[in-house]
Amino acid sequence: MKEVGNHFAEQGEDVDFLWCSSDPDSLDGIVLKKRRIALLDGTAPHVVDPQNPGAVDEILNLGEYWVSDEIRAQRGSVISCNERTSAMFQMVYGYLAAAGKRAEFLAEVLQRMLGEESVFEARRALQTKIGSVLTVRRTEAKRNRDRAMGCLQAPGSCKRAFAGAITPDGIKNELPSLIHGLEKVILLHCPEGFPVQKILEPAMERLLDAGFDLEAYYCPMDPAKKLEHIVVPDAGFAIVTCNRYHTVKADSNTQKSLNITLEVPKNVDPVLQEIR
């Protein structure tokens, strides 16, 4: 998959590389966006069955090419390795569940420390910086004119994914590749653990309402709720959350960076200060 993806990327095509969280040097899939073609690893633990076999979906069965006799000779080692791997996965998921509870508690504490006013100011600052993007201003103005004339307005679409993962080699992310080629990057600096979706979700709703197709990237620790990054390719900008677990620098030669900082106040409740 790497060779296929790199082949088309070298020809200038827009290719999504879907990296594996269990093995960060391997791919689970690639997407050739303009061609509307995806190549996926359909084996466990992410089995994918064809939805329209033959008409749309094709199966590449690499099992036709393995040397069965040599693999069968290692049957005991293969089974033992899989059993150890399964046991390790169960242990890791236990640790992640505990870390998830800590993250929930930390989010509540940080909200109390920062207060609604700080969150409101950060939300307003973000909306202002989004409004400074020329493409957004022009698109919203046109949408408003069309609405005034009674024209139907279709919202934009949202692709949801992960920009990073918790891997055996530590926390990994591909943020630099996501902002590559964009004109502006809005960097939202906030304490790790803060529920940054409270700031980002209104921005995402605004952009979708304006008709922009966007990419929304979620936190692996809270994939159902915690929005962390937004990329708007057609408007040439992205919003990236920066903390000690993931940060990115805009290219000073080709990109303009806009910063918003949400800091924990120094004078807070003594109990909360201890937690900090």
Where do the language-model regions lie?
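Context-gated lysine
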Residues: 2, 33-34, 101, 129, ...
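Conserved nucleotide-sensing/catalytic segment adjacent to the nucleotide-binding pocket
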Residues: 5-72, 76-77, 207-276
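Charged, amphipathic alpha-helical linker segments immediately N-terminal to NTP-binding catalytic cores
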Residues: 61-165, 261-263, 270
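Long, low-complexity, Lys/Arg-enriched
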Residues: 83-85, 168, 179, 276
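Generic hydrophobic/packing signal
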Residues: 93-96, 110, 190-200, 204, ...
